[in-house]
Amino acid sequence: MIHAFSDGGSRNNPGHAAWGFVIKVDNITIHSEGGYIGIATNNIAEYTALIKALEWLEMNKKNENIDFFLDSNLIVSQLNGIFKVKNADIREFVLKARQLEPSFKKITYTHIPREKNKEADALVNQALDNHLYGI
């Protein structure tokens, strides 16, 4: 089973924003990635992380079962059809996710506490610190 952990963050929301994701197979990290977006909201950053992870998985793990873990209850609830997507910008991200989902056998989205998403969160902060402070 493939587990994907994604996270996004925005300092001062909206503010400087970044994304990160970690892909694990049998609890071993096989890929991790993060990047700076620019000025954006936290939700845009969260969805950017999800899309970046889905795109990487489509290129490298097509036709597999994917379990996604996110610490944003809003995003998980929107992807699982519990909450409606009202924002037009966010709707574009949901449509992109829906276009990528058929590349996989099965895909699930599960909400987890922030403390269980530390690796993806660290990539977000690393990308922000690197852009803002050069560290």
Predicted features and spans:
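Generic detector of bulky aromatic hydrophobic side chains
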Residues: 1-4, 19, 45, 72-74, ...
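RNase H catalytic domain
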Residues: 9-13, 51-135
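Residues at secondary-structure transition points
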Residues: 39-44, 48, 85-88
